[in-house]
Amino acid sequence: PPIEASESESLRDSTLLVLTAGQEQNVSACLDGNVKETGADKDLGNYVRIVASDDKELFLYGLSSISVEVGQPLLKSDYVGSIEAGGKLYVGLLIQGQPENPAAYFILKTGNV
């Protein structure tokens, strides 16, 4: 799971999963892959884009800090950055270039996403 969320919701026709952090915490990769891009989105904040070998791309937006570099290999659960208390983490997923509902690929439990 990227973070322990106090609540979750979907945006943009379920192509973005929004997780609210109850406290400041580290954000983890949700799949194995390589960091393809880092940057800042004017609407969603700082982000990391992770590309996996099986045509999946994971986007993590809303980070208060980024701890990875472009080209860096990552394993599932590796630390990629952090999010502030009360901050929103926006999770996007592409499969073969098409937006998919990230909630379908992650186990959602109360307190854990």
Feature locations, PLM:
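Residue-level recognition of beta-strand microenvironments
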Residues: 2, 38-39, 63-66, 83, ...
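Envelope-exposed proteins and targeting segments
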Residues: 13-15, 23, 31, 44-46, ...
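Small beta-strand-rich domains/subdomains or short beta-sheet motifs embedded
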Residues: 20, 26-30, 60-61, 71-74
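Active-site/binding-pocket entry motifs
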Residues: 4-10, 35, 41-42, 99
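Conserved, short, structured surface segments that act as functional micro-motifs
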Residues: 49, 70-113
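Short glycine/threonine/proline-enriched tight-turn/helix- or strand-capping micro-motif at secondary-structure
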Residues: 2-29, 52
